[in-house]
Amino acid sequence: MRKQFFIFTLILLLLITYTCYKLVFAFNLSKLESLAVTLPLFFLMFGNFFVSRINPLMDEKKWYQYLTILGSLLMGLWGTFIIFSIITDFVKIIILIGINFLPSQSVVYIEISDWLFKFSNQYSFIIPIVAIIITVLGFLETIRGPVIKKIALKHKNINSDLHDFRIVQISDLHIGPSIQNEYINKVIQRTQQLDPDIIVLTGDIIDANPKIFAEQIQLLSHLKAKHGVYCIAGNHEYYWEINTVLNSLKKTNLTVLMNQNNIIKLNNTNLMIAGITDPTSKKMDPLNSPDLNKTLLNAQNLIIDFKILLAHQPNIYSEASQIGVDLLLSGHTHGGQFFPFNLLVPLVHKYYRGLAKHHEMAIYVNPGTGYWGPMNRFGIPAEISLLVLTQD
């Protein structure tokens, strides 16, 4: 724990230092002025993560909720500014290393050096402007709410009973200070218009104290489907006392699957809906650590024609494929949530957005129906996924 705290503190100090350095050049500030801007900025962006856990009652206060939303907007602006700054600084370093191999009096050396000087000083305002544009457009995208994406999903094990079976997937809603009644009702209304056979919520439904946001959680009771509404916990549910979160979900009409499954009978076909716990449970709820064999246990010894596994994080794909899962539904990655962070996600996750196939298993990773942290969805809109099973 001490090691993790040390690493976190070191990274935070490096980010503060780098931000101060970039603000000096971008806005022609003194070092002291830059520090005076950076410290309150970091508190607004990240302070709520600590304050809400130290004193959860703060989330009830409207002014604090507005402050959290402001921090979310600033986080998106800062994140975009920093990532573009890091990229441009990296390119400049590569160029500087390259021109050192040229004669210092050569025309090429002088022209490149002059361009680098102008870009670092006279044109340093470009990155903040780009960051502001991306932040504004990304914020407007979050206000619009999730889009509907329809996917025709083909698989060799889809028979005539399963043909045209409609699965609506909601993921990473992150109910909390910035996602409340209006946004949740928008999600519910758009979901119900899709005439779902089942609805699945693949984790990170709640990202705040469930006692304070009980009203918002209860709204999920309005989700209705012919064969039920199923959900699993993501990693964020564990940050708010998992048992309290699960109890609040069980007060709705959602069926919570914790290493469990349910079998739906469609004429002569048995469809299994299974849900596995998140890897976070290994440390925070070890009695309910992920157990794929237990999750897919067929206690009734029925012939299962099609197996659907709900797993918040998609990195379980290899084990799921080996054990015979037909369709893996996941979330967690947010697809990067907004440009340019979507370009970094493939470095961590093999399957991070949309439809894919691993051997014989189909995978769909929902990029998030809500958002986390920055109120920014530039280039990666929030999504409600409609998967229509289609016979080959």
Model-found features: residue ranges?
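Short amphipathic alpha-helical coupling elements at transmembrane boundaries
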Residues: 28, 65-72, 153, 168, ...
